[in-house]
Swiss-Prot record:
SUPFAM superfamilies: dsRNA-binding domain-like, Ribosomal protein S5 domain 2-like. Residues 42-105 form the S5 DRBM domain. It holds the Pfam family Ribosomal_S5_C. The gene is RPS2. Component of the ribosome, a large ribonucleoprotein complex responsible for the synthesis of proteins in the cell. The small ribosomal subunit (SSU) binds messenger RNAs (mRNAs) and translates the encoded message by selecting cognate aminoacyl-transfer RNA (tRNA) molecules. The large subunit (LSU) contains the ribosomal catalytic site termed the peptidyl transferase center (PTC), which catalyzes the formation of peptide bonds, thereby polymerizing the amino acids delivered by tRNAs into a polypeptide chain. Keywords: Cytoplasm, Nucleus, Phosphoprotein, Ribonucleoprotein, Ribosomal protein, Ubl conjugation. It comes from the Eukaryota. Component of the small ribosomal subunit. Interacts with zinc finger protein ZNF277 (via zinc-finger domains); the interaction is direct; the interaction is extra-ribosomal. Interaction with ZNF277 competes with the binding of RPS2 to protein arginine methyltransferase PRMT3. Signal peptide: none annotated. This is Small ribosomal subunit protein uS5. Citrullinated by PADI4 in the Arg/Gly-rich region. Asymmetric arginine dimethylation by PRMT3 occurs at multiple sites in the Arg/Gly-rich region. One of its GO terms (cellular component) is nucleolus.
Protein backbone atom coordinates (compact mmCIF):
# COMPACT_ATOMS: atom_id res chain seq x y z
CA UNK A 1 0.00 0.00 0.00
CA UNK A 2 1.86 3.07 -1.23
CA UNK A 3 2.07 6.10 1.00
CA UNK A 4 3.70 8.72 -1.20
CA UNK A 5 2.37 10.04 -4.51
CA UNK A 6 5.39 8.54 -6.19
CA UNK A 7 4.47 5.16 -4.76
CA UNK A 8 0.96 5.46 -6.18
CA UNK A 9 2.28 6.36 -9.61
CA UNK A 10 4.52 3.30 -9.51
CA UNK A 11 1.65 1.09 -8.40
CA UNK A 12 -0.54 2.31 -11.27
CA UNK A 13 2.31 1.57 -13.69
CA UNK A 14 2.52 5.26 -14.63
CA UNK A 15 6.28 5.16 -14.15
CA UNK A 16 8.06 2.68 -16.38
CA UNK A 17 11.54 2.70 -14.87
CA UNK A 18 13.65 4.08 -12.07
CA UNK A 19 15.36 6.32 -14.61
CA UNK A 20 12.22 8.45 -14.84
CA UNK A 21 12.34 9.01 -11.10
CA UNK A 22 16.01 10.04 -11.23
CA UNK A 23 15.37 12.30 -14.22
CA UNK A 24 13.14 14.51 -12.08
CA UNK A 25 15.30 13.76 -9.03
CA UNK A 26 12.33 12.82 -6.90
CA UNK A 27 13.08 11.58 -3.42
CA UNK A 28 12.29 7.89 -3.03
CA UNK A 29 10.74 7.48 0.39
CA UNK A 30 9.62 3.87 0.13
CA UNK A 31 11.87 0.87 -0.32
CA UNK A 32 9.04 -0.99 -2.05
CA UNK A 33 9.50 1.25 -5.08
CA UNK A 34 13.01 -0.12 -5.51
CA UNK A 35 11.79 -3.69 -4.95
CA UNK A 36 9.19 -3.11 -7.63
CA UNK A 37 11.72 -2.11 -10.27
CA UNK A 38 14.83 -4.05 -9.31
CA UNK A 39 13.33 -6.73 -7.10
CA UNK A 40 14.86 -9.81 -8.65
CA UNK A 41 18.30 -8.51 -9.48
CA UNK A 42 19.07 -6.80 -6.17
CA UNK A 43 21.85 -8.23 -4.06
CA UNK A 44 22.84 -6.96 -0.65
CA UNK A 45 26.10 -7.35 1.18
CA UNK A 46 26.80 -6.52 4.80
CA UNK A 47 30.00 -4.51 4.78
CA UNK A 48 30.45 -4.33 8.52
CA UNK A 49 28.68 -4.68 11.81
CA UNK A 50 30.25 -2.74 14.59
CA UNK A 51 29.24 -2.29 18.20
CA UNK A 52 28.88 1.31 19.32
CA UNK A 53 28.60 2.23 22.95
CA UNK A 54 26.97 5.02 24.86
CA UNK A 55 28.15 5.66 28.39
CA UNK A 56 25.30 5.75 30.91
CA UNK A 57 25.55 5.96 34.65
CA UNK A 58 24.80 2.26 34.84
CA UNK A 59 27.64 1.31 32.52
CA UNK A 60 27.63 1.03 28.76
CA UNK A 61 24.71 0.89 26.42
CA UNK A 62 25.78 -1.22 23.43
CA UNK A 63 24.07 -0.96 20.10
CA UNK A 64 25.01 -2.39 16.75
CA UNK A 65 25.67 -0.36 13.68
CA UNK A 66 25.33 -2.13 10.35
CA UNK A 67 26.67 -0.96 7.01
CA UNK A 68 24.93 -2.54 4.05
CA UNK A 69 25.61 -2.11 0.37
CA UNK A 70 22.96 -3.00 -2.14
CA UNK A 71 23.08 -3.11 -5.92
CA UNK A 72 21.87 -4.89 -9.02
CA UNK A 73 25.32 -5.21 -10.65
CA UNK A 74 23.95 -3.12 -13.47
CA UNK A 75 24.08 0.59 -12.81
CA UNK A 76 22.25 0.97 -9.51
CA UNK A 77 23.85 0.99 -6.10
CA UNK A 78 22.88 2.09 -2.62
CA UNK A 79 24.43 2.31 0.82
CA UNK A 80 22.60 2.11 4.12
CA UNK A 81 23.71 2.55 7.71
CA UNK A 82 21.52 1.67 10.64
CA UNK A 83 22.01 1.51 14.37
CA UNK A 84 19.91 -0.79 16.50
CA UNK A 85 19.93 -2.83 19.70
CA UNK A 86 20.02 -6.15 17.88
CA UNK A 87 22.17 -7.12 14.95
CA UNK A 88 19.29 -8.48 12.88
CA UNK A 89 17.15 -5.36 13.13
CA UNK A 90 20.15 -3.19 12.36
CA UNK A 91 20.85 -5.15 9.19
CA UNK A 92 17.22 -5.14 8.17
CA UNK A 93 16.96 -1.39 8.68
CA UNK A 94 20.22 -0.80 6.86
CA UNK A 95 18.96 -2.77 3.86
CA UNK A 96 15.82 -0.64 3.72
CA UNK A 97 17.86 2.55 3.99
CA UNK A 98 20.23 1.28 1.33
CA UNK A 99 17.28 0.75 -1.00
CA UNK A 100 16.07 4.28 -0.39
CA UNK A 101 19.50 5.68 -1.15
CA UNK A 102 19.94 3.84 -4.45
CA UNK A 103 21.50 6.03 -7.13
CA UNK A 104 22.06 5.45 -10.83
CA UNK A 105 25.66 4.96 -11.90
CA UNK A 106 26.87 6.51 -15.09
CA UNK A 107 29.25 4.26 -16.90
CA UNK A 108 31.58 5.16 -19.72
CA UNK A 109 34.59 4.04 -21.69
CA UNK A 110 38.34 4.23 -21.46
CA UNK A 111 39.42 5.23 -24.93
CA UNK A 112 37.47 3.65 -27.77
CA UNK A 113 33.76 3.22 -27.43
CA UNK A 114 33.33 -0.45 -28.24
CA UNK A 115 30.75 -2.72 -26.67
CA UNK A 116 29.10 -1.99 -23.35
CA UNK A 117 30.33 0.86 -21.14
CA UNK A 118 32.45 -0.72 -18.46
CA UNK A 119 34.21 1.90 -16.34
CA UNK A 120 33.58 5.33 -14.82
CA UNK A 121 33.08 8.09 -17.41
CA UNK A 122 35.69 10.41 -15.93
CA UNK A 123 37.81 10.79 -12.83
CA UNK A 124 35.51 11.41 -9.90
CA UNK A 125 36.21 11.97 -6.25
CA UNK A 126 33.99 11.53 -3.26
CA UNK A 127 34.70 12.32 0.31
CA UNK A 128 33.28 11.78 3.75
CA UNK A 129 35.10 12.89 6.87
CA UNK A 130 38.82 12.75 6.16
CA UNK A 131 38.43 9.98 3.63
CA UNK A 132 38.78 10.90 -0.01
CA UNK A 133 38.14 8.29 -2.69
CA UNK A 134 39.09 8.89 -6.29
CA UNK A 135 37.77 6.71 -9.09
CA UNK A 136 39.82 6.68 -12.27
CA UNK A 137 38.72 5.09 -15.56
CA UNK A 138 40.62 1.95 -16.52
CA UNK A 139 40.98 0.01 -19.77
CA UNK A 140 38.77 -3.01 -20.31
CA UNK A 141 39.91 -6.18 -18.59
CA UNK A 142 41.65 -4.39 -15.73
CA UNK A 143 39.08 -5.33 -13.13
CA UNK A 144 38.51 -3.18 -10.07
CA UNK A 145 41.81 -2.11 -8.59
CA UNK A 146 40.76 -1.13 -5.13
CA UNK A 147 40.51 -1.89 -1.45
CA UNK A 148 37.94 -4.53 -0.44
CA UNK A 149 35.32 -2.00 0.71
CA UNK A 150 35.00 0.15 -2.41
CA UNK A 151 35.48 -2.96 -4.52
CA UNK A 152 32.19 -4.40 -3.27
CA UNK A 153 30.39 -1.15 -3.92
CA UNK A 154 31.85 -0.77 -7.39
CA UNK A 155 31.03 -4.36 -8.29
CA UNK A 156 27.45 -3.80 -7.20
CA UNK A 157 27.34 -0.67 -9.30
CA UNK A 158 28.22 -2.77 -12.32
CA UNK A 159 31.54 -1.06 -12.96
CA UNK A 160 33.91 -3.67 -14.36
CA UNK A 161 37.15 -1.75 -14.64
CA UNK A 162 38.31 1.03 -12.38
CA UNK A 163 41.43 2.29 -10.68
CA UNK A 164 40.92 3.82 -7.26
CA UNK A 165 43.04 5.79 -4.87
CA UNK A 166 42.08 6.59 -1.31
CA UNK A 167 43.40 9.23 1.06
CA UNK A 168 42.76 9.78 4.73
CA UNK A 169 41.74 7.44 7.48
CA UNK A 170 40.31 4.65 5.38
CA UNK A 171 40.19 2.41 8.43
CA UNK A 172 36.93 4.14 9.35
CA UNK A 173 34.92 1.79 7.24
CA UNK A 174 31.76 3.85 7.39
CA UNK A 175 33.41 6.91 5.95
CA UNK A 176 35.36 4.84 3.45
CA UNK A 177 32.15 3.32 2.15
CA UNK A 178 30.33 6.65 2.17
CA UNK A 179 33.14 8.37 0.29
CA UNK A 180 33.07 5.66 -2.37
CA UNK A 181 29.31 5.93 -2.60
CA UNK A 182 29.64 9.70 -2.87
CA UNK A 183 32.07 9.31 -5.76
CA UNK A 184 29.82 6.80 -7.53
CA UNK A 185 26.81 9.06 -7.19
CA UNK A 186 28.77 12.00 -8.60
CA UNK A 187 29.19 10.22 -11.93
CA UNK A 188 25.90 11.72 -13.09
CA UNK A 189 26.54 15.22 -11.77
CA UNK A 190 29.54 15.68 -14.05
CA UNK A 191 29.01 17.51 -17.30
CA UNK A 192 31.23 15.63 -19.73
CA UNK A 193 32.08 16.86 -23.24
CA UNK A 194 29.69 14.40 -24.87
CA UNK A 195 26.83 16.10 -23.05
CA UNK A 196 27.82 19.61 -24.13
CA UNK A 197 25.18 21.68 -25.83
CA UNK A 198 25.87 22.46 -29.45
CA UNK A 199 27.11 26.04 -29.48
CA UNK A 200 25.12 28.01 -32.00
CA UNK A 201 27.28 30.80 -33.40
CA UNK A 202 25.23 33.90 -34.01
Amino acid sequence: IPVTKLGRLVKDMKIKSLEEIYLFSLPIKESEIIDFFLGASLKDEVLKIMPVQKQTRAGQRTRFKAFVAIGDYNGHVGLGVKCSKEVATAIRGAIILAKLSIVPVRRGYWGNKIGKPHTVPCKVTGRCGSVLVRLIPAPRGTGIVSAPVPKKLLMMAGIDDCYTSARGCTATLGNFAKATFDAISKTYSYLTPDLWKETVFT
